């Protein structure tokens, strides 16, 4: 539904104040990529990559304008190549053009030719200047939307937005508040997006035998994974892709599990593999969410799994509800295991079958509750006892760091790393950039590691090579040291 001009004006003011109601608004100073500045509260980071870019603001704005029906793609210059839907019109910027408040300004020429730049018209001004609301004008991708007077240099197009005539937000609100008997609140429903990836996976030829519940070892929500992965291409998918990504109130269906396999268990695609036999769903934000938020993300996954089990005619049991660690050596699902069994596979190694069954039984109970009652509630293990999650546990997900005489911070961690699409130079004996070269870890290669280190501005993983050498491989950049370190974007996928 189109917005009124009053609603649009209110939205732009909220952007400028850093108070906009958006899931992509940064709530506190945040940094995950040392290539850019630390994002201040109020910045918009819609895809979880490269901090608060100019396009992030537009992605959020268009989602709001279209009631979450249209998600933009590409860089700023690509916005004039796509359709936002009914009511949106693309205009060339002519010498006589005076834009209206709320229009989208697109810069594609001159110094903006490579990537483009984009913002929102805050004040149409005149044919010489106008006021733009934008992000990343300074190149550091760290500020909330900021107003600036622009002289139209490089500005080639405007995108006119639909505006609804009629009552304003204030009148509508007053009308509702005058009602003596307000309508009861609707129960929140789970939104499922079927925006499938742009690659056709192999067909299974039958329904899946069950669901593997993963923890994503990442920081993105289901919507953010959709935004970053839907059109990522084969090179990224080869590093691992699940059928579903779930967070509070939202599940992204990346692949149709009823018809196609996914690459989520790391054990090949043979007829007996987890990839072939089972669907896979990621509980999102296992490395960033609070316990309370992560438990809400889990509930979305349980609710969705219950719906799929009904659709597929499956009963939740230990054969149909599976863990990633049952197929390959991995700590996944690490966060869920800590919360619901008290065992930390990252610091304590592989759990016993009894502990794995304890977690599976918890998952099974939650899924059954949704199938039978349509609802469920979380419980956690704290101090060895199961308790309600109304006061979430605060147990740390990672173990304690230690520092050696060389200034290297280190801790044990048993997991798997799948390299991205670029080779990485490894080092022998120590995690230093001037240590002897061990070779190149090829793109797409998988290694099982037992140690994590922070040294020389990088996070390293340590493992024993087949020839007996102790090898260290950098896997991302890192600012600072424990407990206040800020890791950069991972160069591959952790499982």
UniProtKB/Swiss-Prot annotation:
Enzyme class: hydrolase
Lineage: Viruses, Duplodnaviria, Heunggongvirae, Uroviricota, Caudoviricetes
Positions bound to Zn(2+): 214, 324, 332
Biological process according to GO: defense response to bacterium; peptidoglycan catabolic process; proteolysis; symbiont-mediated cytolysis of host cell
Descriptive protein name: Endolysin LysK
Domain comment quoted from the record: Contains a cysteine-histidine dependent amido-hydrolase/peptidase domain (peptidase C51/CHAP domain) at the N-terminus, a central amidase domain and a SH3b cell wall-binding domain at the C-terminus. The CHAP domain contains a tightly bound structural Ca(2+) ion and it is present at the N-terminus and is associated with the endopeptidase activity. The SH3b domain increases the CHAP domain activity.
Domain Peptidase C51: 29-160
Catalytic activity, reaction form: Hydrolyzes the link between N-acetylmuramoyl residues and L-amino acid residues in certain cell-wall glycopeptides
Start and end residues of each N-acetylmuramoyl-L-alanine amidase domain: 205-334
Keywords: Antimicrobial, Bacteriolytic enzyme, Calcium, Cytolysis, Host cell lysis by virus, Hydrolase, Metal-binding, Multifunctional enzyme, Protease, Viral release from host cell, Zinc
Catalytic residues as annotated in Swiss-Prot or TrEMBL: 54, 117, 134
Pfam families attached to this UniProt entry: Amidase_2 (PF01510), CHAP (PF05257), SH3_5 (PF08460)
Record: residues binding Ca(2+): 45, 47, 49, 51, 56
Effect recorded for residue 51 to A: Reduced staphylolytic ability
Family: Belongs to the N-acetylmuramoyl-L-alanine amidase 2 family.
Spans annotated as Disordered: 378-398
Record bears the keyword Chloroplast: no
Cofactor binding annotation: Zn(2+) is required for amidase activity.
Compositionally biased region (Polar residues): 378-393
Keyword Lyase: no
């Amino acid at each position: 539904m189109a917005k009124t001009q009053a609603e649009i004006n209110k939205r732009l003011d909220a952007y400028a104040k850093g108070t906009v109601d958006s899931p992509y608004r940064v709530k506190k100073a945040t940094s995950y990529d040392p290539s850019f500045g630390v994002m201040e509260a109020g910045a918009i980071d819609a895809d979880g990559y490269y901090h608060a870019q100019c396009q992030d603001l537009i992605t959020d704005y268009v989602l709001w304008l279209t009631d979450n029906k249209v998600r933009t793609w590409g860089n700023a210059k690509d916005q004039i190549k796509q359709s936002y839907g009914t009511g949106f019109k693309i205009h060339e910027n002519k010498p006589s053009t005076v834009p209206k408040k709320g229009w989208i300004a697109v810069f594609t020429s001159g110094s903006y030719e490579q990537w483009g730049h984009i913002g929102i018209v805050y004040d149409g001004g005149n044919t010489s200047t106008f006021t733009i609301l934008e992000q990343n004008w300074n190149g550091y991708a760290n500020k909330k939307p900021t107003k600036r007077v622009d002289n139209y240099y490089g500005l080639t197009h405007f995108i006119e937005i639909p505006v609804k005539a009629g009552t304003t937000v204030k009148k509508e609100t007053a009308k509702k508040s005058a009602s003596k008997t307000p309508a009861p609140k609707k129960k929140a429903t789970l939104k499922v997006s079927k925006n499938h990836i742009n690659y056709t996976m192999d067909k299974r030829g039958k329904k899946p035998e069950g669901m593997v519940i993963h923890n994503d070892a990442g920081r993105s929500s289901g919507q953010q994974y959709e935004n970053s992965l839907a059109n990522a291409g084969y090179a990224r998918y080869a590093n691992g892709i699940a059928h579903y990504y779930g967070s509070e109130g939202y599940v992204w269906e990346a692949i149709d599990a009823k018809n196609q396999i996914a690459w989520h268990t790391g054990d090949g695609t043979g007829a007996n593999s987890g990839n072939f036999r089972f669907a896979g769903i990621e509980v999102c934000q296992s490395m960033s969410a609070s316990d309370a938020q992560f438990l809400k993300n889990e509930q979305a996954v349980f609710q969705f799994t219950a719906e799929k089990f009904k659709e597929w005619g499956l009963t939740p049991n230990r054969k149909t509800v599976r863990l990633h660690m049952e197929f390959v050596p991995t700590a996944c699902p690490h966060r869920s295991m800590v919360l619901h069994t008290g065992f930390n596979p990252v610091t304590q190694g592989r759990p016993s079958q009894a502990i794995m069954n304890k977690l599976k039984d918890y998952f099974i109970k939650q899924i059954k509750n949704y199938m039978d009652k349509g609802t469920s509630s979380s419980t956690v293990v704290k101090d060895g006892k199961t308790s309600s999650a109304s006061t979430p546990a605060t147990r740390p997900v990672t173990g304690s760091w230690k520092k050696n005489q060389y200034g290297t911070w280190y801790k044990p961690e048993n997991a798997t790393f799948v390299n991205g699409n670029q080779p990485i130079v490894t080092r022998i004996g120590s995690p230093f950039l001037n240590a002897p070269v061990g070779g190149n870890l090829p793109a797409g290669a998988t290694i099982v590691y037992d140690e994590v280190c922070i040294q020389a501005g990088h996070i390293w993983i340590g493992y024993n090579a087949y020839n007996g050498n102790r090898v260290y491989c950098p896997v991302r950049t890192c600012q600072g040291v424990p407990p206040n370190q800020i890791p950069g974007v991972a160069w591959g996928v952790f499982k």
